[in-house]
Each structure stands twice: as C-alpha cells, then as structure tokens.
Amino acid sequence: MDEKDEEGEKDEGTGQRPTKQVIVIRRDLRMRRGKEIAQGAHASMAWLRQRVVPHLTPAGVADQVKFSEAERAWLDGSLRKVTVKVGSEAELLAVYDKALEAGVAVHLITDRGLTEFGGTPTRTCLAVGPDYDDRIDPVTGDLELY
C-alpha cells in the first residue's frame, strides 16, 4: 500500500514527496539532436542561475541562497528530469502560462538563432520546476513523453 500524507504521495524508497523538473521541447522546429539537448540544459540551468547568481559574493561564493523544501529535496536527491514535447510555440506558451497560474517555477528559453533558425530569436523550450510532482503534474501531466 502506498504511504500518503495530507501534502501528497510519498516515494516508496525515501519516504519523501517525489520531486522533478520537466523539460518541454518544441518538436515543430526540427532542431538537431545536439541543439535540443543544449536547449534543454539551458532551461534546466536557468532555474539554478536565477536562484544562485543574485547571491554570489565577490569571491564567487553563493551566500544566503534560500531554497524551498521541494527545491532542497530535488537538489539533495535524484535531480530527476522528465522530457516532454509540444508541437508549436503556442503550445509551449500555453504550458508557460499554466505553470505561472499554478505558481510553479518556469523558465522559457529563447535561442538567439546564431546556429539555427536563420538568425531569428526563437522560443525553443522551457523548464517547469523543480518542485513536488503533485504540483508539476497538473501543468505537464497531459504532455507526451519525448
């Protein structure tokens, strides 16, 4: 039987609420595989950059960064990521808006277009979270796995 509490389902292995980050990639752009991977990495790291860079000291040490319980659990745990796909910019932006409405961290990536897209800045992907699965799933749970 699954162990649950009032805040949501718990992971059977750790007894903690499961956490993840979901990377949403636009497939209509037909990016090269390496480009897709790089864009997804940019999306994932955008969260960390936003949280840490403002707290860097002149010596380059992140001082006084405060992570939520979910963020700390994700960082201390598996750093689990799930990649899903959408078929258009409109679908990508709909996920972005849905995450904002749900109060879940979301980071939209716009590629500068230097190596693909003919020099045109192009929205390629986004990252939702990290957060608890039960907060992210209402935002991305209906999207197809990549």
Placement of each model-derived feature along the sequence:
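Positively charged, small/polar-rich N-terminal and surface patches that mediate targeting and assembly
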Residues: 1-146
